[in-house]
């Protein structure tokens, strides 16, 4: 077993340089170790869970399964729910939606998902995972979901 824990260059939601760090770490591991490409799994918690959603939906061909834990999945959904109508310019909203795991959920049709979230999470609200799991189930994706009491 080979385990990678790329940092993703800090707090960038695993986009841009953070996404590249993860992809380059996987490529380097494949180059240096005899890895079965059908047994590469992606997981992470909180910011890492956000990265797991993001990277798995953009690169589903790389993973046998994904297990996001307390991951954030869609910025506009969150801001609309918390603050009402978004004040972002239309181009910004459409840009973020084009890269949002929530709007790319269909790309996980062939990638089993095992999602976990704490019911009392105050950083990434539990409705983030609930919404994604509902969407995945509507799309008939393979998804298991567990909410953990007293976990925040």
Model-predicted regions and their roles:
Residues 14-19, 53-55, 66-68, 76-82, ...:
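Short, solvent-exposed loop/turn and secondary-structure capping segments
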Residues 42-44, 69, 116:
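Short beta-strand immediately N-terminal to the catalytic nucleophile in serine-hydrolase-like folds
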């Amino acid at each position: 077993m080979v385990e990678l824990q790329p940092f993703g260059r800090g707090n960038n939601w695993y986009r841009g340089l953070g996404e590249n760090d993860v992809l380059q770490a996987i490529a380097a591991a494949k180059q240096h170790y005899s890895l079965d490409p059908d047994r590469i799994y992606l997981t992470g918690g909180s910011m890492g869970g956000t990265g797991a959603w993001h990277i798995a939906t953009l690169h589903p061909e790389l993973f046998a399964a994904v297990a996001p834990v307390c991951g954030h999945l869609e910025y506009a959904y969150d801001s609309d729910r918390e603050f009402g109508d978004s004040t972002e310019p239309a181009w910004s909203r459409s840009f973020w939606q084009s890269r949002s795991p929530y709007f790319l959920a269909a790309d996980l049709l062939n990638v089993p998902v095992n999602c976990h979230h704490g019911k009392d999470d105050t950083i990434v609200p539990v409705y983030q995972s609930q919404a994604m799991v509902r969407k995945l189930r509507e799309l008939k994706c393979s998804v298991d979901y567990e909410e953990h009491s007293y976990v925040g």
